């Protein structure tokens, strides 16, 4: 299995009792091996750099295999081969589609804190996080597309710079050790264990992954001496026209398209720098949400502003007692 040739196989197990089949289990898998040597990641014995996208699952518009297919098709179309499902457990079909389409997945837990998040001063959180990670690894470890595990996202910067609680860092360091060991126990086949936006977990983890920063930040990540990557980069989600104007001047103020042109300039240079400096995983944050044009779902007359009553994709009436989510409507332009 490689992104270029995502060959898959099936294991079919049957339990028989007195010549009668009483249970059957089907498991799909792919043959491949990821290894780390020095500062480089290898796939099937060859150096292999990953170029990915990332986004945070938003809900109903993303709850179809077709959305996963569209996202991964866009990733392939931008000459990339990887994805990080950001900060939560995604539906299984995302990994199924990645297996089939040749997308390498940095599988990330829900142990994240970006600008708020979990109650990091509660023992209950830290205990629950271990069971969560165990179940997460057991669920997804047979997917060929999963190349590594991201065990947390931005916990450290939130502890230090949002909560201003440096006394919580010993607890976080202990958790990194426990989370790393849980991954080793339940999946000894994947050496990539990282914490997105937290460097190498103060030396605890085998891989370094940073967020944002500049050339000096990348030099610092390289100096750690491990395979390294960037999980989030660019100012796409926060850059004001004033900030973007450093790339394309007053054009950044004229329209959203002008702003995006400036961001494209920034992102191009960031990606060039990441590649030239030998990142094992390079990305900007992100293509799916900020760089793709949203689709006018269920809207025929695009000359008028959409309304809740007339536009969108409408579903059937709510049925009491039926399990699962029952959406009422998916609105135009909600896919990106």
What is each of the regions a protein language model found here?
Residues 2-3, 54-66, 74-86, 108-128, ...:
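The substrate-binding groove and active-site-proximal loops of carbohydrate-active enzymes
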Residues 1-92, 97, 101-105, 132, ...:
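Secreted/periplasmic carbohydrate-active enzymes, especially glycoside hydrolases
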Residues 114-121, 202-204, 217-221, 238-240:
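Short, charged, surface-exposed secondary-structure boundary motifs
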Residues 35-39, 90-93, 126-138, 198, ...:
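Alpha-helical scaffolding within the catalytic cores
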Residues 91-93, 114-115, 155-159, 200-202, ...:
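Flexible loop/turn segments at secondary-structure boundaries
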Residues 147-149, 172, 176, 181-184, ...:
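Substrate-binding clefts and catalytic carboxylate motifs of secreted carbohydrate-active enzymes
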């Amino acid at each position: 299995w490689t992104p270029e040739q995502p060959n898959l196989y099936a294991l079919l197990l049957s339990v028989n009792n007195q010549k009668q089949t009483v249970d059957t289990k089907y498991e799909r898998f792919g043959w491949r091996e990821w290894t780390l040597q020095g500062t480089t990641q290898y796939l099937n014995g060859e150096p292999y750099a990953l170029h990915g996208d990332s986004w945070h699952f938003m809900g109903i518009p993303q709850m179809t295999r077709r959305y996963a297919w569209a996202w991964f098709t866009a990733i392939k179309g931008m000459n990339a081969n990887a994805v990080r499902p950001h900060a939560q457990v995604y539906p299984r079909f995302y990994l199924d589609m990645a297996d089939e389409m040749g997308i390498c997945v940095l599988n990330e837990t829900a142990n994240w804190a970006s600008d708020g998040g979990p109650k990091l001063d509660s023992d209950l959180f830290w205990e629950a996080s271990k069971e969560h990670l165990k179940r997460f690894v057991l669920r997804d470890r047979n997917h060929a597309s999963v190349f590594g595990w991201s065990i947390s996202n931005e916990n450290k910067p939130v502890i230090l710079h949002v909560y201003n609680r440096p006394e919580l860092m010993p607890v976080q360091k202990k958790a990194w050790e426990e989370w790393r060991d849980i991954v080793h126990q339940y999946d000894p086949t994947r050496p990539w264990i990282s914490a997105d936006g937290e460097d190498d977990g103060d030396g605890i983890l085998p891989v370094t992954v940073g967020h944002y920063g500049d050339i000096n930040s990348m030099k610092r990540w390289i100096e750690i001496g491990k395979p390294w990557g960037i999980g989030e980069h660019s100012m796409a989600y926060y850059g004001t026209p004033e900030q973007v104007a450093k790339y394309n001047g007053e054009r950044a103020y004229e329209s959203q398209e002008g702003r995006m042109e400036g961001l494209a300039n920034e992102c191009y240079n960031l990606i060039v720098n990441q590649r030239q400096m030998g990142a094992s995983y390079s990305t900007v944050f992100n293509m799916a949400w900020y760089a793709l044009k949203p689709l006018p779902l269920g809207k025929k007359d695009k000359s008028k502003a959409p309304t809740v009553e007339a536009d969108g994709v409408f579903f059937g009436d709510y049925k009491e007692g039926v399990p699962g989510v029952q959406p009422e409507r998916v609105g135009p332009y909600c896919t990106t």
